A protein has these predicted regions:
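C-terminal transmembrane helical hairpin of 12-TM major facilitator-type secondary transporters
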Residues: 213-263
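Intracellular juxtamembrane helix-capping segments at the cytosolic ends
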Residues: 43-56, 254-269
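Helix-to-loop junctions at the C-terminal end of transmembrane segments
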Residues: 87, 199-212, 299-300
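Juxtamembrane intracellular "pre-TM" segments in multi-pass secondary transporters
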Residues: 117-151
Length: 328
């Protein structure tokens, strides 16, 4: 909870200068402020998920994580739609001002929340508010140095590489190659996020009927096929296919994210569960960073089609480790 509050304040302070700075192009000031903001976004995300890992019992994880991730994805879609409207209707400074207002409202939730002094379901066990370095290392080692945890870390380190590549180049690809406008993309992409949010909210029910393994592998395979399909798109590609791709990539990404996070939470059962889950999430953030940074290199080594093929191939380790993690 402490790190959630600190991160939320830092995120708002990092964006505050952008209300007054005229932004006409990318510059060092903009890069520095957004990098600082995104750093605390990552810390906040890890802290929120770690708090959930501590606050929920194992049999609650799938449904609760579905609600968490589904709500987050719905929020991202709504935010993108609202940002597109404000940006094109009023300007970038007004968009940042509105963002800070919304963040100030959201800040009230962690401010008035409470944190358990124990891992949910393990009230009878002794837990300390602060651990020595030796105790921390012992607790982390107990949970992370086993085959399931190693498979989970492998999954997470590859999980967002493809999405990270896509996120960097899709906008330019849709504008330069497919002939779309930035405004069209901005109004369309939230639909995929909203669909992903609905998938997240219903993940617990879907997993009950279809099985967690089938759904996880199905969503990952769908995302890989979308990347492969986009690699073949040209200026003559029907808008309907381009629309399905840009909507589908966010929808299926949210679907498998909900499932894998519930699996990761179930692996965190020691008194360092929050730290352990934070490590898993850290690997996921590193994966996105890898994808974002190699995207220009991959694009420079070939073309857009080659970059999307690399994005698809990066999901193969996730299929293998996902199969292992969902064994009975």
């Amino acid at each position: 909870r402490f790190w959630i509050l600190i991160s939320q304040v830092a995120m708002m302070l990092a964006l505050l200068p952008l209300i007054f700075i005229e932004v006409k192009s990318v510059n060092l000031t903009l890069i520095a402020l957004l990098t600082l903001h995104n750093t605390f976004v990552a810390i906040s995300d890890i802290s929120i998920d770690a708090l959930a890992a501590d606050s929920l019992k194992e049999d609650q994880l799938a449904n609760a994580n579905g609600f968490m991730w589904g709500s987050k994805t719905l929020g991202r879609g709504t935010g993108m739609a609202l940002a597109t409207f404000v940006f094109y209707g009023y300007g970038v400074n007004e968009a940042f001002f509105l963002l800070i207002l919304l963040m100030s409202f959201i800040f009230l939730f962690p401010l008035f929340s409470k944190e358990l002094s124990y891992k949910a379901g393990f009230q009878s066990e002794s837990y300390k508010n602060r651990l020595t370095l030796k105790e921390l290392i012992a607790g982390v080692s107990q949970s992370l140095f086993n085959m399931s945890a190693l498979a989970a870390m492998t999954f997470m380190i590859f999980s967002n590489i493809g999405y990270g590549i896509f996120d960097v180049i899709y906008n330019e690809f849709y504008i330069e190659v497919l002939g779309w406008s930035g405004e069209e993309i901005g109004y369309l992409r939230p639909i995929g996020m909203w669909l992903g949010g609905l998938l997240g909210l219903s993940a617990g029910v879907l997993a009950f009927y279809f099985g967690k393994r089938f759904l996880l592998l199905f969503f990952i395979t769908c995302q890989a096929f979308i990347f492969l399909a986009v690699s073949s798109f040209t200026a003559d590609t029907p808008d309907s296919l381009s629309t399905i791709a840009i909507i589908g990539v966010d929808a299926v990404d949210a679907g498998w994210s909900v499932l894998i996070f519930s699996i990761l939470m179930a692996l965190c059962t020691t008194n360092t569960s929050a730290t352990n889950f934070g490590i898993f999430m850290g690997f996921g953030n590193i994966s996105m960073l890898i994808g974002n940074n190699i995207a220009p290199l991959v694009l420079g080594s070939g073309d857009y089609g080659f970059a999307f093929i690399v994005a698809a191939l990066s999901l193969i380790p996730c299929l293998l480790t996902g199969y292992y993690l969902t064994r009975s």
